[in-house]
Amino acid sequence: MGKAKFPRQLKDNEAKAVARTIRVSPQKLNLVAAMIRGKKVGAALADLTFSRKRIAGTVKKTLESAVANAENNHDLDIDSLVVAEAYVGKSIVMKRFHVRGRGRASRIERPFSHLTIIVREVIEKVEVA
């Protein structure tokens, strides 16, 4: 697999933050990422604050980093930001041994994940009556 030959280029109204090697399985992390996908940043932060999932704090920290990148690096208005993309990638799998009875051992796999969050500035159209 590895890196993509032509990674996706960010548009002028987008900002990105990446959290690498997070100690959680991609399946569990994707549940939280799907929860914020497509929402306004304020609503997504509120959802993550009150989520009972263990990994929600790390996702919130990454989202706050994306918002800070949008504000400081791209001069975007943070009140009109939307979570455009939130996707999860598979990272390494750490192998450990678990001692069992009768001199046996079994293998435990501890998966890691990558998280990428892209926020986009959306200008809402005002209808004139």
Swiss-Prot record:
Cellular component aspect of the GO annotation: cytosolic large ribosomal subunit
Any GO BP: translation
Keyword tags: Ribonucleoprotein, Ribosomal protein, RNA-binding, rRNA-binding
Signal sequence annotation: none
Keyword ATP-binding on entry: no
InterPro entries in the record: Ribosomal_uL22, Ribosomal_uL22_bac/chlpt-type, Ribosomal_uL22_bac/org-type, Ribosomal_uL22_CS, Ribosomal_uL22_sf
GO molecular function annotation: rRNA binding; structural constituent of ribosome
Keyword Zinc: no
Superkingdom: Bacteria
Pfam annotation, one family: Ribosomal_L22
Functional note: This protein binds specifically to 23S rRNA; its binding is stimulated by other ribosomal proteins, e.g. L4, L17, and L20. It is important during the early stages of 50S assembly. It makes multiple contacts with different domains of the 23S rRNA in the assembled 50S subunit and ribosome. The globular domain of the protein is located near the polypeptide exit tunnel on the outside of the subunit, while an extended beta-hairpin is found that lines the wall of the exit tunnel in the center of the 70S ribosome.
Record family assignment: Belongs to the universal ribosomal protein uL22 family.
NCBIfam families: rplV_bact
Subunit structure comment from the entry: Part of the 50S ribosomal subunit.
UniProt-recorded name of the protein: Large ribosomal subunit protein uL22
Originating organism: Bartonella henselae (strain ATCC 49882 / DSM 28221 / CCUG 30454 / Houston 1)
